[in-house]
Amino acid sequence: NTRSRGLGDVYKRQAGFYYKTFMWPKSFWYKIYEPFIRKAAGLGVASIEKDKERYEHKFEYCDLLVTGSGPSGLASAYAAAKNGAKVILAEDKPRFGGTLLTDDVSIDNLSGKDWAEKIITELKSMPNVTVKNRSQVFGYYDHNMLVMFERVSDHLEKKSKFTPRQRLWYIRAKETILSTGSIERPIVFGNNDTPGIFLSAAAKEYMKVYGVLVGKKPLILSLIHISEPTRPRI
């Protein structure tokens, strides 16, 4: 195990052990025990400085809200928009396309990446469509009320003083399509969260999207065929 070990790892105590351990004397709890425990837990202190950034709230409605811009999300948003629906397409990551950016697929005689770019370009040109990247839909409430967090300018080197840093959207949608994709199921073993261990989907994204090689001599462990298309790429 190469992980840096914290205080809890050293003493290997179960969670909440201090509630039964530091019982006596009672007067020590607030002055000695609790301050020590909170310091050991690494709890931070909230800043008292004024935040100079701008933040906005926005209220919007739509016929269809699509979360995720993979193949199913793009196809759904495009079909609805072509039929005149007011559509909002939300993508959490900076780039649209989802698995189309990493998988070798072909749609309408185009590569997945080129097809995604074509659809996004068309969607952006439609007056009834709002396309947002760096935007995470994190709340789904009664009567199709959804809340979306947009990172507006954190990635910009230069920006106007009137440009908000972040924007919180309150969206009332008639219909919602959750096209957030699926998460690759990991193989569970001890310390499988240490640096240098990747899911195949993550390894492909590093290579295809960011141009980063995860290793020169990788060991690939898989129980299903999903690693077959990944192996030659690595």
Spell out what each predicted region is:
Residues 3-67, 113, 120-217:
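FAD-binding core/adjacent interface of flavoenzyme oxidoreductases
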Residues 62-128, 136, 187, 205-209, ...:
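Beta1-alpha1 glycine-rich phosphate/pyrophosphate-binding loop at the start
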Residues 1-7, 11, 224-234:
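Single conserved hydrophobic/aromatic residue that forms the stacking wall/gate
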